Amino acid sequence: MTELKNDRYLRALLRQPVDVTPVWMMRQAGRYLPEYKATRAQAGDFMSLCKNAELACEVTLQPLRRYPLDAAILFSDILTIPDAMGLGLYFEAGEGPRFTSPVACKADVDKLPIPDPEDELGYVMNAVRTIRRELKGDVPLIGFSGSPWTLATYMVEGGSSKAFTVIKKMMYADPQALHALLDKLAKSVTLYLNAQIKAGAQSVMIFDTWGGVLTGRDYQQFSLYYMHKIVDGLLRENDGRRVPVTLFTKGGGQWLEAMAETGCDALGLDWTTDIADARRRVGHKVALQGNMDPSMLYAPPARIEEEVATILAGFGQGEGHVFNLGHGIHQDVPPEHAGAFVDAVHRLSEQYHR
C-alpha cells in the first residue's frame, strides 16, 4: 500500500506526538456542500450513491479538496447491515430511514442472516478499496459501523424514533429476544469492520448514536457489553500498522470510564461533555475526539475561532486529541464556516504540541 503522507490523525488516536491537533468532521461529506448535492442528484437517491463505488469515492474526497482535513471517512450509512439482513430499507422524504419488515419478536431475530461483508455488503468494500486507491496516501481512511444497540433501535422501531418505546418494550418485556438480536448484530458488525480494515480502512469508529437514551445499568447491559465484544474481535493491526478503534456514544459522557475499559483507543465526545473533565477522567487510558457543538458553525468565523481556542485550552498541552464536532455537521452550514473551523484548529493548536 502507498506510504501515508499525513498520519497525524492515527498518531493522535494512539496518543503519539503530532505537530498540530488533527481535525476532521463527522458527516464531512454531505449536504452542506453544493458538489455533494450535485453528485447525489446524479446518483438518483441516497442508497444508490452508497452502492456506487465511484460516486461514493467522489463524495468522500469532496471535503478534502476544499479543506486540509487530516482524515477521510468512508461515505456510507450505518443502516447497511440491517439492509443486508433483508429488512427492506427505504427513505421517506422528511421522515428519514424506514424498514418495511421491522423486527418484532425472537422468531424474527432467528430468521435474520449474518451478512457476508464481501457479498451482500461487497459494495461497501468496493468503495473502501476505491477510496484508498484514490487517496494516494494523502490522509488515512476511517471505516465505521453503527453499534448493535443503535442498529437495533432502527430495526425494532422500524425507523427513527423520539421516545424508543417499541425497543424499550422489547428490552423490558422480552429481553431474551433483544439480547439475541444484539448478539447477532455484534457478530455482523465485527465481520463488517474487519472486512473494511482488510479492504483498506486504517482506523474504525463505532457510532452509538442512541446509547444515551438508556439508564446506566441498561447501557452497560444492552449497549456497552456488545461494543466491548466487537472491540475484542477486531483486527488491531493491518499492513504493518496499528488500526485504532474509536467508540462514540452520543449522550454518554457520564460513562466514559466504563467505555475506556473496553480496550478501544479513543472515545468520541459530544458537545455536552467538558473536554477538560473528560481528559482528567480517562485521558491516561484513551485519546479523545471532539467536541464542538455542530451548531457553532452557524456563528461568524471569529466566534468559531474563539470556541476552537476554548476547546483546545480545555484539552491542554500534549497528545491524544483529535478535534471534531460533537456530532455530524448540519446540512445548512455555510461551507466557508467549516473552512474557518478547520484552519483555526491547525493554526491555534501548534502551541499545545511544543
From Swiss-Prot:
Its EC number is 4.1.1.37. One of its GO terms (cellular component) is cytosol. PROSITE patterns: UROD_1 (PS00906), UROD_2 (PS00907). The keyword Hydrolase does not apply. Pathway: Porphyrin-containing compound metabolism; protoporphyrin-IX biosynthesis; coproporphyrinogen-III from 5-aminolevulinate: step 4/4. CDD domains: URO-D. The record marks D77 as: Transition state stabilizer. It catalyses: uroporphyrinogen III + 4 H(+) = coproporphyrinogen III + 4 CO2. It is an enzyme of class 4 (lyase). InterPro entries: UROD/MetE-like_sf, Uroporphyrinogen_deCO2ase_HemE, Uroporphyrinogen_deCOase. It is found in: Cytoplasm. Its main location: cytoplasm. Keywords: Cytoplasm, Decarboxylase, Lyase, Porphyrin biosynthesis. GO terms for molecular function: uroporphyrinogen decarboxylase activity. Belongs to the uroporphyrinogen decarboxylase family. Catalyzes the decarboxylation of four acetate groups of uroporphyrinogen-III to yield coproporphyrinogen-III. NCBIfam families: hemE. This is Uroporphyrinogen decarboxylase. The lineage of its organism: Bacteria, Pseudomonadati, Pseudomonadota, Gammaproteobacteria, Enterobacterales.
